[in-house]
């Protein structure tokens, strides 16, 4: 007789009532959205012009998008019709991860303002409000039932390992990981209700459109602070979508409609140069396509002539030249 040892549990990190935790998470996310419409600094010396009321700019846009995602995931926990599609795994881990990403982006922005402009005095009240409500959202999300590793399943604690990994990860990440203990989802991902083919194709097209926009937004960032904030938001956002099971659901649709997926990928690649503000990436792409075509042609010609070894050399040589261009 074999014993099954559970390595995961669904428990909150902070012992507060689930209803109160979810309500606070929703409220915190909504307030974070509102805070992006306030000025975070009084001077436009910081890139992105975060001085305007009623119009988010620069890094505020990243906080806004992350906060909206947090609001959607937290609200989906109430069983709102239509929102269940975005969290088929029914896991609160996605809510916590995107809330953590919102917090990290917001605090990175405000700290960058203070460091670059010479102190917290350069922050407007809106900046302090954003810091407070994003922190509230993360704390509230820790009160939701999270899928966590059991204490028994963690690596055995040892002070040398703890100190070493804490130093490597910046003295914060590893201790927090051991404290929060986020684990995998023990439940099966719910299968979506069958949709008409045209609706599934629209979802695939929309997914490729969003992916193209996110990619082009990242490579077109105009300053380092925005790029770092972009990396933070995308990393936590993708992790949240993965834990929610949404990436798996989209993957299932693309597998079902392979031809449509291939067409969508080609259309996205064709549209990519038209999304650029300069010709740099378009020229690189054109050069790669030219040499890829030459390599394919050489391979076909020498292959028909029976000179297969020469074909391999030609293909690799042209590929190496194209890679050097990149």
Predicted regions and their residues:
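Canonical alpha-helical transmembrane segments
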Residues: 66-84, 236-245, 303
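Membrane-interfacial amphipathic/re-entrant helices at transmembrane-helix boundaries
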Residues: 11-24, 28-66, 107-130, 151-291
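Hydrophobic core segments of alpha-helical transmembrane domains
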Residues: 67-78, 131-145
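Alpha-helical membrane-associated segments of multi-pass integral membrane proteins
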Residues: 121-140, 309
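Cytoplasmic-side transmembrane-helix entry/capping segments in multi-pass membrane proteins
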Residues: 89-99, 251-262, 284-290, 310-318
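Short, intrinsically disordered terminal tails adjacent to the first/last structured region
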Residues: 1-11, 18, 25, 93-97
């Amino acid at each position: 007789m074999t014993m099954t040892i559970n390595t995961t549990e669904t428990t909150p990190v902070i012992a507060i009532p689930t209803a109160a935790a979810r309500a606070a998470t929703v409220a915190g996310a909504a307030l974070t959205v509102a805070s992006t419409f306030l000025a975070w600094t009084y001077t436009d010396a910081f890139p992105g012009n975060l001085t305007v009321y009623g119009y988010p700019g620069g890094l505020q846009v990243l906080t806004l998008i992350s906060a909206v995602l947090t609001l959607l995931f937290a609200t989906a926990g109430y069983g709102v019709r239509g929102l269940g599609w975005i969290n088929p795994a029914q896991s609160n881990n996605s809510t916590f991860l995107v809330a953590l990403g919102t917090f990290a982006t917001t605090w990175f922005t405000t700290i960058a303002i203070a460091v670059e402009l010479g102190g917290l005095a350069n922050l407007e009240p809106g900046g302090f409000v954003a810091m407070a409500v994003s922190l509230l959202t993360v704390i509230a999300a820790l009160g939701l039932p999270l899928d966590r590793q059991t204490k028994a399943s963690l690596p055995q604690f040892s002070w040398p390992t703890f100190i070493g990994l804490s130093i490597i990860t910046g003295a914060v990440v590893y201790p927090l990981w051991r404290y929060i203990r986020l684990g995998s989802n023990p439940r099966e991902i719910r299968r979506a209700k069958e949709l008409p083919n045209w609706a599934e194709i629209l979802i695939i097209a929309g997914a490729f459109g969003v992916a193209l926009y996110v990619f082009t937004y990242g490579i077109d960032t105009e300053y380092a602070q925005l790029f770092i904030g972009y990396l933070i938001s995308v990393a936590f956002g993708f992790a949240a979508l993965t834990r929610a099971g949404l990436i798996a659901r989209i993957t299932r649709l693309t597998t079902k409609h392979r031809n449509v997926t291939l067409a969508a990928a080609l259309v996205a690649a064709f549209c990519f140069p038209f999304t650029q503000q300069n010709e740099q990436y378009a020229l690189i792409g054109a050069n790669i396509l030219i040499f890829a075509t030459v390599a394919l042609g050489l391979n076909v010609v020498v292959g028909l002539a029976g000179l297969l070894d020469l074909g391999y050399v030609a293909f690799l040589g042209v590929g190496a030249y194209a890679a050097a261009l990149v």
